[in-house]
Swiss-Prot record:
Subunit text: Homohexamer.
Pfam families named among the record's database cross-references: AAA, AAA_lid_3, Peptidase_M41
Protein name (record): ATP-dependent zinc metalloprotease FtsH
The keyword Flavoprotein appears for this protein: no
Swiss-Prot/TrEMBL keywords: ATP-binding, Cell membrane, Hydrolase, Membrane, Metal-binding, Metalloprotease, Nucleotide-binding, Protease, Transmembrane, Transmembrane helix, Zinc
């Protein structure tokens, strides 16, 4: 998002330019200033001697300045109409001699007259203080002009080194100070600063995102589009007597596009769009959050119609005075102020408040009522069709192989959010660069899916052949149960390459995506999770089962517990014993259930029954298909990774799929790729469907023929009966 108020200023660049400008000005001043010639210290003493010997006011020193920082002596010497300006690079002792003098000479001057002093020049040349001599000369010749007292127009001045340094740097320092003060003023204007901490933290943003940049989420987009249209054409809705909605809350899992939808709203609305994170309200000072809320709504009212978008609303919107930690006065004050501003005494005509959160369930009820957030829209995880659209959107501008089919990728990514799907495409792009391929190929897409789900493969991990074989049996067990138990999860991909903390990895998806599941389907799903453990028990015995089923058991137990405590699918009856409270620190009660220890024991028994029954289903399915188990295991040991099409080929033909290199009788090699294998399986399935349809049609014809025969026989019997009568 780009700030609309002010463009971003590169202060570092400005400071550098300012310093360069100051240095350039200093160089120019030095370049065009009058030039002074360097002279020796003896040359200066010679002029001192000439001035001392002169009996008129024509020879004198107009100025002598001694810089104690570098011991340079600046001199302006007058000899009649001639004016000579020069400087002397003196030593520290020479400069000190001119300003401090010689104790012996000063004593002579106190006792002798000027002539004696002049005589001393000849005998003590270079050892006297001419400054002291000037004072003595003026004291003995009061009639001389003070400005031209035979020697000096001014006293010798010893400049302070610090003052000299300040004179050299004052201009660059002034520029730097001005720039610094401007930067601090701009910072205070943006964030309130120490002198105005309660200043509005929301920024007016402008973005080029549109609703066309969002794939999936059609219902949320329609809801938001209506509000944007209201802001653009309020008269149309006013004529119908419609009230402008005050707020819209976007909820749902992380990564589903809530903030992206807000960006698109900003791009479409063409009205001031205030963006702020809820965590920006509460900071150091008491009452700061409430003040910032007031300032934000005050500015929004001035620019109405406008939209205020508060991201991560649960940071300040959680239920008041609840949870383990109790209430938080500062957060609750901020929430109270938001409630008042959204629906209080002050009117908010033309202001739409949008909020986004992952936890709508922990928000305060007063925040969710109509009149504040009139609409609560759930931006959920995309279904298979929406996943395909999202993948196509994020693939724009990327070079993809023609073999890649987005519908198959969507089928292999159930439960993925939009952010995860974008990450899949990005990971595949990075793999393409790493492997130096011109285009993104299907194997890179498969690897990207695995990386997003379970992390990168640990190919360097050393695993014994026996352990690898056990992992292959475990993963093959999942595949067999998925194929043979109706309603269970189907394995889309299996690998025995370690990922994360797991020795192997399998991707299981339901036969079709459904919003509701029957008890039979849930039991089949649990059975598919227990397929790995069942295979271990059959092959190695109950005493040699491994820890590889840890995650499977966890998932199976979670489903079984919900069947008992939430969905009423057990002998305990249709009673809800537990609430879904995974994190009590988000404003929930700590206790998950309202039942005693006896009921908890009964719940555990029912969960055990469900899992045990499902495990028996898995064991039975594998025992009846041991040959299929062995074939899938062999394929895994040979290839390390297999996909759903290869598993279906093995089930259909009860043999391993052809290798990538198949030798012809004449010795030439023929490549059989995975796409050909998939087509073979699909063609076989299509033929089976046609065959089954033909059988059904034949059976239907036979039934019709039998019915006609029966009707004919019945009619003849009725005719005979009539004749008999």
């Amino acid at each position: 998002m780009d700030k609309m108020k002010k463009p971003k200023i590169n202060w570092l660049l400005i400071v550098i330019v300012g310093i360069i400008a100051a240095l350039l000005i200093t160089v120019l001043v030095l370049l065009f200033s009058p030039k002074t010639q360097p002279k020796s210290f003896d040359y200066l003493l010679k002029h001192f001697e000439e001035a001392a010997k002169s009996t008129t006011d024509d020879i004198y020193f107009e100025t002598i300045k001694i810089n104690s920082l570098d011991n340079t002596i600046g001199v302006i010497f007058r000899n009649g109409a001639m004016r000579e300006e020069y400087f002397v690079a003196a030593s520290a002792a020479q400069a000190n001699f001119l300003t401090s003098g010689n104790v012996e000479v000063r004593e002579i001057l106190q006792l002798a007259n000027v002539q004696a002093y002049i005589q001393s020049i000849k005998t003590l040349n270079g050892t006297i203080s001419w400054f002291t001599f000037m004072n003595k000369f003026l004291a003995q010749h009061p009639g001389y002009d003070a400005s031209k007292a035979g020697l000096f127009g001014q006293h010798i001045v010893q400049e302070n080194g610090f003052i000299t340094f300040i004179k050299a740097i004052w201009f660059p320092a002034l520029i730097a100070i001005i720039i610094f003060l401007g930067y601090k003023a701009q910072s205070r204007a943006a964030s309130g600063g120490i002198f105005n901490p309660g200043k509005n933290q929301a920024v007016i943003v402008k973005t080029d995102k549109k609703f066309t940049d969002i794939a999936g989420n059609k219902e949320p987009i329609e809801e938001v589009q209506e509000l944007v249209d209201y802001l653009k054409n309020p008269k149309k809705y006013a004529a119908a007597g419609a009230r402008f909605p005050k707020g819209i809350l976007l909820g749902g899992p992380p990564g589903t596009g809530k903030t992206l939808l807000a960006k698109a709203t900003a791009g479409e609305a063409n009205v001031p769009f205030f963006f702020i994170s809820a965590s920006s309200f509460v900071e150091l000072y008491v009452g700061l959050g409430a003040k910032r809320v007031r300032e934000m709504f005050k500015e929004a009212r001035k620019l109405a119609p406008a939209i205020i978008f508060i991201d991560e609303l649960d940071a300040v919107g959680r239920s008041r005075g609840s949870g383990i930690g109790g209430g938080n006065d500062e957060r609750e004050q901020t929430l109270n102020q938001i409630l008042v501003e959204m629906d209080g005494i002050n009117e908010n005509a033309g202001i739409l408040i949008m909020g986004a959160t992952n936890r709508t369930d922990v928000l305060d009820p007063a925040l969710l009522r109509p009149g504040r957030f009139d609409r609560i829209i759930t931006v959920g995880l995309p279904d298979i069709k929406e996943r395909e659209e999202i993948l196509k959107l994020h693939s724009k501008g990327k070079r993809l192989s023609k073999e890649i089919k987005f519908d198959k990728i969507a089928k292999r990514t159930p439960g993925y959010s939009g952010a995860q799907l974008e990450n899949v495409i990005n990971e595949a792009s990075l793999l393409s660069v790493r492997e130096k391929t011109d285009v993104i190929i299907s194997t890179q897409i498969d690897e990207a899916i695995d990386r997003v789900m379970a992390g990168p493969a640990k190919k360097s991990r050393v695993i014994s052949q026996e352990e690898l074989k056990a992992v292959a049996y475990h993963e093959a067990g999942h595949a067999v149960v998925g194929l043979k138990v109706k309603g269970g999860n189907k394995v889309q991909k299996i690998t025995i390459i370690p990922r994360g903390n797991a020795g192997g990895y399998n991707l299981m998806t339901p036969e079709e995506e459904k919003y509701n599941a029957s008890k039979k389907e849930l039991l089949a799903t649990i059975a598919s999770y227990m397929g790995g453990r069942a295979a271990e028990m059959i092959i190695y015995g109950k005493e040699n089962i491994s820890t590889g089923a840890s995650d499977d058991i966890s998932r199976a137990t979670k489903i079984a517990r919900k069947m008992v405590t939430e969905w009423g699918m057990s002998a305990l009856g249709p009673i809800k014993y537990e609430e879904d409270t995974e994190n009590p620190f988000l404003g929930r009660d700590y206790s998950k259930g309202t039942f005693g220890s006896k009921m908890a024991h009964e719940i555990d028994l029912e969960i055990r029954k469900i899992i045990s029954a499902s495990e028996e289903i898995a064991i039975k399915a594998i025992e009846q298909n041991l040959e299929l188990l062995e074939l899938i295991k062999d394929s895994l040991l040979e290839n390390e990774t297999i996909v759903a099409e290869e598993i279906e080929y093995i089930e259909k033909n009860m043999k391993l799929p052809p290798n990538n290199e198949k030798i012809k009788p004449d010795g030439e090699s023929k490549k059989v790729n995975i796409e050909d294998l998939i087509n073979q399986v699909n063609e076989s399935q299509e033929k089976d469907k046609q065959k089954n349809a033909q059988i059904k049609e034949d059976l239907s014809k036979m039934d019709k023929k039998d019915n006609l025969t029966k009707a004919k026989d019945k009619g003849e019997e009725e005719t005979l009966a009539e004749k008999a009568e």
